[in-house]
Amino acid sequence: MLYRLHLDLLDSQPPIWRRLWIPGILPLTDCHRVFALTMGWEVTADYWFKPALSSSVNPPHQPSLPAGSTLADWLLQPGDSLIYLYQPSQGWLHKVTLEAIASPMEALTPHPLPEGWLAHCLEGEGACPPAFCHGVWDYLELLDRLDGADDPDYDGLWQRVGYDFDPDRLDLVAINQRLHTLRMDSDGVSHNQ
C-alpha cells in the first residue's frame, strides 16, 4: 500500500512542507533518503525518527525508533505521525503525518507513476533552507538579514545563498527528478543516476 504523507519542517516561517506518496513498507532508513531528497537535504546526513504524541502506536520512553522499522509499523491510520530529525546537531525537526493509505491504482489515478518509481511529491511550499544554516532559527535570522539592505553583510549573504534564492519558491519538477532516481531492490533503496 502507498502512504500519502505530509512532511512539515517545524517552526519555519514561511512554511516549508511537502506532500508525497511513498510505500508503507519502506524501512525508516530508506525513508530518510526519500525525505532528504524531497526536502532538498543531503542523504548522507545524520538523522533519527521517534514517535509523535499523536501516534496511535507510542511506546513509552523510546528516544528513537529502530532502524529496521517501516512506516507501516508506526503509522497505522490517517492522523498518526512521526518526528523526523535531520542533522540532530542542528535540530531540523519535521513532523511526518499519515494523511491517507491507498493502493497504487487508487493513489495515482489519473496520473500513474512509471514502473519502478519509489516516491512522488504531489505538492509543497517553500524552498529548502541553505545547507550552511544551523537550524530553523538560524534560517529565520538569515531571511530577516536578506530582507534588510542596511545589513552590513547584505551583499555577502546574497552571494552565499545565490542571487536566485527565493524562500517561497518550490521546484516540484526538480524534487521529482531526484525522487525518480530511487529504486527499491532486495537491499533496500538504491540511487540510480
Residue ranges and their predicted role:
Residues 1-193:
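Short linear regulatory motifs enriched in tryptophan with gly/pro/ser
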